């Protein structure tokens, strides 16, 4: 009856949600939205309307599902060891259905981006190509810690920040003028992404070593990867906090504080970790 069908639908939606890797979806949504608000706050633009933000967000999220889904689809055997709870190794999702979701997500991302603007289409296409190169042979950046960190940094640090900022500026203001905050923010996210690229492999050393993935945690040990990643993340925070404190950057006190508090929390948690 209706109840079993409803339960099946809920299970399917939950499986899809897990397949999207929710933390990446949330991160992408926050980045794309924050950049929109930043551009919107600049004087002289057109009035706020969802016609720019919503389709841009949809294209970004669909592209995110394509990249994370392709990563899982290409890594089933490794994930049986490292992440057996993910939908494919857990038997909740077949590889064929997963591939269908991946390809449909790519199609949605490109079609929506093309509808919005040629620039956004090119941006989403470039991000998708790098996402493919991250997971798929012959390039497969993720097999080597430098390639993985470089790919993640280019996408998260440069293309998303600078690309979506330029896209919104063109749509809302008709020209590209860089806000002074964009450079430091892009540098921060780029450095932060390097640390994250090293951190995320720390729990996965067993499967990565067995399948010859040259991650930093496999090559140098989990403890060294944690320390190096922590150093890079702390440097990212300090690089944006110190110039503001000495007056080199025109940030208000609350802005500097908004970076300082997470830094304190991060250092505190990192000091307690045992790997």
Language model features by range: what are they?
Residues 2-275:
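Multi-pass alpha-helical membrane architecture of UbiA-family
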């Amino acid at each position: 009856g209706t109840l079993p069908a409803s339960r099946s639908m809920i299970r399917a939606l939950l499986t899809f949600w897990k397949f999207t890797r929710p933390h990446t979806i949330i991160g992408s949504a926050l980045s794309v939205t924050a950049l929109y608000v930043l551009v919107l706050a600049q004087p002289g633009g057109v009035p706020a309307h969802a016609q720019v933000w919503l389709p841009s967000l949809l294209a970004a999220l669909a592209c995110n599902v394509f990249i994370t889904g392709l990563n899982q689809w290409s890594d089933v055997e490794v994930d049986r060891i490292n992440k057996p709870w993910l939908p494919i190794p857990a038997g909740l999702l077949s590889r064929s259905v997963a591939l269908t979701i991946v390809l449909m997500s790519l199609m949605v991302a490109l079609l929506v981006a093309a509808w919005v603007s040629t620039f956004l289409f090119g941006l989403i296409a470039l991000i998708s190509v790098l996402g493919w190169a991250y997971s798929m042979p012959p390039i497969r950046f993720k097999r080597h810690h430098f390639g993985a960190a470089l790919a993640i940094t280019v996408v998260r640090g440069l293309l998303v920040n600078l690309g979506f900022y330029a896209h919104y500026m063109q749509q809302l203001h008709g020209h590209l003028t860089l806000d002074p905050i964009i450079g430091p923010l892009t540098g921060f996210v780029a450095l932060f992404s390097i640390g994250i690229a090293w951190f995320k492999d720390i729990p996965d050393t067993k499967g990565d070593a067995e399948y010859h993935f040259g991650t930093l945690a496999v090559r140098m040990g989990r403890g060294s990867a944690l320390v190096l990643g922590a150093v890079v993340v702390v440097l990212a925070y300090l690089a944006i906090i110190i110039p503001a404190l000495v007056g080199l950057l025109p940030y208000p006190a609350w802005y500097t504080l908004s970076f300082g508090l997470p830094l304190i929390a991060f250092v505190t948690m990192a000091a307690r970790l045992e790997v």
